[in-house]
Amino acid sequence: NKKKLYALTQFYESGLFNHLQSLKNAKTVILFGSMVRSDWYSESDIDLFIYGDDDDFEIGKYELKLKREIQLFNAKNKKKLRKMGMGLVQNIIQGYFIKGTIDNLGVELKCLNS
């Protein structure tokens, strides 16, 4: 899909992917939403999920570079992930994994149902 490839190329060339991969205390980082589904348009935001600590994420820098708002969803621990709700979490895990794997969330996802 050309639209998806274009978006991913922009994120890579801006340095966003490298920056997200370098976040020391982020266990999992996932791009999801319209950018991954390829149904984005010029005003669409960028949906990102970070499991773990996102304190080092330079959100403003990349919003300026990409000329798009970044909608950040964060869960620092199991309790926060549980509060996000299963529907949102299912949407997130269908996204593009920038860092980590689904295994990083496996135990935590089971806890959502408990």
What is each of the regions a protein language model found here?
Residues D45-D47:
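Acidic Asp/Glu-based divalent-cation binding sites
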Residues N1-K27, V36-S42, Y51-S114:
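Catalytic core of pol beta-like nucleotidyltransferases
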